[in-house]
């Protein structure tokens, strides 16, 4: 199979784009892909531009500043709590990555999946997201989470026990700075007044906030602050089981639950394409199966009301990732 960077493959991708876009519009399902741990800027550009040329909807970047040498048992999405990446896994800084992705692409949305909100100063973080939104002409998604890795909090001198309330306050600050002419905030963890914040984001009323997490606290955060619920490492059936609580809480606080986009992030690997699966630990909720099983799974997601899927991969090789995306576009999209 020719590499995606070849002229032949580039022409094939271009021919597929219009059909793929039209098909996804008809099925009301947006699909995006999270960048693997890449360090080569040419490979990152190739990945992002392939997502765009295949007609998919978004490119996403994860967030870790450091990883501990010692094995952790805190990761929520494996049976024994161990993380699925080694301590040497390269994570480029998330907002920097989003700026790079904005420059590489023209149409796709670019988002964080998810930025750990308490790790960064809230005013500077709001400025960084607003800047990327301006530079990308309004394509940024602010995917947020509270974090889970205590060692990372300790290293950054951020109180682990306060990560939930800090996240809530930071999100309040984001919206204030992005929308108010004269922003002012007097909270438990942060205060400011007598300032202005420009430029505002291009997207109105503000950059969309997609809230990650799988707990009831996370679901309440979605309803209180979010435009979408973006859990990770879960199955469609699990997500469906949590929707009654989301709807009930939304009605309780006077919000229409239908305003909230439902998104799900999972690992994708086809078992019938000849691509080898890496030997790293599997996370829960992975979609690892045949082409038909993936088709059935996406239909199931659509029936539940999920309208956006974000996939990552069981391989760090950019060309294998691209082959997976091509197979999804060529074999799965038409079947939906």
Q: Where does each model-flagged region fall?
A:
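Active-site-adjacent structural elements that line small-molecule/cofactor binding pockets in enzymes
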Residues: 7, 14, 18-336
């Amino acid at each position: 199979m020719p590499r995606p960077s070849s002229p032949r493959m580039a022409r094939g991708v271009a021919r597929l784009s219009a059909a793929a876009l039209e098909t996804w519009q008809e099925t009301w399902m947006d699909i995006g892909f999270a960048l693997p741990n890449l360090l080569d800027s040419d490979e990152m550009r190739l990945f992002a531009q392939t997502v765009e040329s295949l007609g998919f909807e978004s490119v996403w970047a994860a967030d870790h500043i450091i990883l501990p040498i010692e094995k952790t048992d805190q990761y929520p999405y494996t049976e024994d709590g161990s993380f699925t990446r080694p301590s040497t896994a390269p994570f480029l800084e998330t907002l920097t990555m989003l700026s790079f992705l904005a420059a590489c692409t023209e149409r796709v949305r670019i988002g964080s999946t998810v930025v750990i909100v308490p790790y960064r100063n809230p005013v500077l973080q709001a400025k960084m997201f607003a800047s990327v939104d301006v530079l990308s002409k309004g394509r940024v998604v602010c995917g947020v989470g509270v974090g889970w890795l205590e060692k990372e909090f300790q290293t950054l001198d951020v109180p682990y026990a306060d990560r939930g309330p800090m996240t809530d306050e930071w999100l309040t600050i984001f919206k204030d700075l992005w929308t108010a002419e004269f922003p002012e905030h007097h909270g438990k963890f942060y205060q400011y007044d007598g300032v202005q914040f420009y430029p505002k984001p291009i997207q109105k009323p503000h950059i969309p906030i997609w809230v990650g997490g799988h707990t009831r606290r996370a679901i309440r955060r979605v309803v209180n602050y979010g435009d979408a619920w973006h859990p990770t490492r879960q199955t469609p059936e699990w997500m469906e089981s949590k929707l009654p609580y989301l709807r009930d809480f939304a009605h309780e606080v006077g919000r229409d639950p239908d305003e909230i986009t439902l998104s799900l992030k999972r690992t994708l690997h086809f078992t019938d394409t000849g691509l080898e699966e890496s030997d790293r630990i599997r996370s829960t909720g992975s979609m690892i199966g045949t082409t038909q099983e993936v088709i059935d799974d996406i239909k199931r997601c659509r029936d539940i009301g999920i309208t956006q899927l974000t996939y990552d991969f069981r391989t760090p090789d950019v060309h294998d990732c691209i082959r997976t995306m091509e197979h999804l576009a060529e074999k799965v999209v038409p079947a939906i």
